[in-house]
Amino acid sequence: MRNSAAHPVPAAPALTEVRLGDQMLRVPSAAGEPVRPVDRLLAGAVTLAPDARVLVLGGGAGALAVMLARRVSQGKLLLMDAEATDLDLAEQTLRANGIGNATVSRDITLAAGQAVSFDAAVMALPKGRKLARRWLLEAAAALRPDGMLFLAGPNNEGIQPVIGDAGALFGPVTPLGYRERCRIARARKGDMPIPPPWAAEPGVAPGTWRRFSAGVRGVTLELESLPGVFAYDRLDDGTRLLLEHLEIPPGARVLDIGCGYGLIGLWAARSGAAQVDLTDSSLLAAAAARRNLDAHGVHQAQVFTGDALAPVAGRSYDLIVTNPPFHEGRAVTSAAAHRFIQQARAALLPGGRFVLVANRFLPYDQVLRPLFGTVTRLADDRRYHVISSEC
């Protein structure tokens, strides 16, 4: 597999002024939620020495990182996140506010040299308890003795169980407050208890992967993935139905949008595609996809991080395939799929096809018909349908 292209330097964004605590900040206007409730909660509770070294896990659009970096004017801040699109926004926010003591990392785990080097870890709850546990383990490894963990998140997204996990890992946890339906707590890295059993779980323990097998059309593929990736430990039923009915033209140029751990792109490469591009906004998904392509000896594929087709702008394809997300947080939404469809139509070569799988209750046929000449239902079952559209 070829390495993906270097991360592009973004154009100067349009900016909006927002308030966080007692400070005014500039953030990209494109940020859907420039200041989250957890940002306000953490900004009011995190105490730092001016020379502190701070690790931020899950910084959103970067407003919190700006405020914390200002507080540690003689120190350093490292920002990590699972989403490349959030890190893009955070980089723009840091630049827009003239922050020079903060670094954005696109690695999925801390480097060995960063262990036991931070005075504080500030963590906003990610999606999924197992990814949260992985981040707690990262924070525990990163903190020096007596370093502090600050953890916050929404009640309805599972912050209370994760605060319990922090207690199992660090020892006693101190609640710091509740506001805007979010909780915040603090833990100190002192004499650590015996690690809980989940601390050694594959994929949860930093540096490890969750291994599993996926059977498609009589072929068994060994795969690896990580918590935070959709259906990270199995072949989901929608993708299975899609692959059972997906035909790859020999020599085709194929794009897999929202690739997850890369199975669709891997299948296309094994089935005769000349070139396969895969995109996902998740750094965890992209890392898993690269790992699976490499493990299966695929050399005609390239994995990109970014939103939808933005990382492959200007490229054209014979076949574009996707199993699009239909949740944003706890809400059901087709916004991502609509964006995928619009962008895919513009990237298809004459005679090209766009194939997607979706829940049957999502009427994507109505979105596809005005854009494509032919829309055909290839397959369906009780939960999913596979739709093919041709130029």
Language-model features: locations:
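Conserved SAM-binding loop
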Residues: 79, 151, 278, 356, ...
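Conserved beta-strand signature within the Rossmann-like core of class I S-adenosyl-L-methionine
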Residues: 146-154, 351-358
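Conserved proline-anchored active-site loop of SAM-dependent methyltransferases
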Residues: 119-130, 257-264, 317-330
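Class I S-adenosyl-L-methionine
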Residues: 171-210, 359-391
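Class I S-adenosylmethionine-dependent transferase superfamily signal
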Residues: 68, 139-140, 166, 268, ...
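SAM-dependent Rossmann-like transferase core, predominantly class I methyltransferases
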Residues: 10, 16-49, 180-251
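Conserved SAM/SAH cofactor-binding pocket of Class I
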Residues: 34-112, 237-322
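A short glycine-rich, Lys/Arg-flanked "PGG" loop and its adjoining helix->strand segment in the class I
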Residues: 133-145, 338-350
